[in-house]
């Protein structure tokens, strides 16, 4: 295990092709081997791995989108025009199409990592809270108040497909087969839509806000935080979780799962807890591998490597770590 102590809170943890990378609230990007870039004037608010797999693309409260590699950083885009908030709220990238999508206020923007001249800006009626690419990287889902919107990433003049459900939607993801869109909601539940007929799926019963969700096991399971264990929703078959109950793994009535991380199609799941512990498990197996047993401040950043052999985490006091995963 390798540990770190940062002077700022960690916004998010990731794995690029070189190892673990942390994005921090002081505007810096820190690589596992100690290399760091001070890139933003202010906090990093969101981050994702660059479509090439090298380094991070970060969005800051300075309104800039920056690609950070070891010892090198460059501005890819800035917020533009009316409807923006002056800072970057959410970001996503597609390795398949090399596109990067980010939101600022009511505006969704799309740029191409291989073409500096390409940009699309799409306007919403309300603030965009989350952004996700479909598996092929050709459509983008955004979460906002009142539901989700679907956009074609490269078409300039279009109207979105609206997926409507009352309430504040705070994050969004596609299922790995592209058949479903799922959002997290402010009122402690998930909502989903089957895209072929826009059929609604209500997925509730959570005791706290859901901050993370991740598909695993070839897309057959959706794991979420927000309960005393990691909640697992079944996504097998054409109906997904409709008419079916969720299960739970790692239940502990003394704490709450604050974050989950996975790397589809693998079956391993990582969970960060409100008491500072971190575990990794295979839902098809037995028991938990507690990779960080020491209790402390709540876990606020968590990532599992693409091959699920390593896990990275950070707590709200700036303490972070990277460890190998061993599951019997």
Where do the model's predicted regions map?
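WD40-repeat beta-propeller superdomains and closely related acidic/aromatic-rich repeat-like regions
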Residues: 1-328
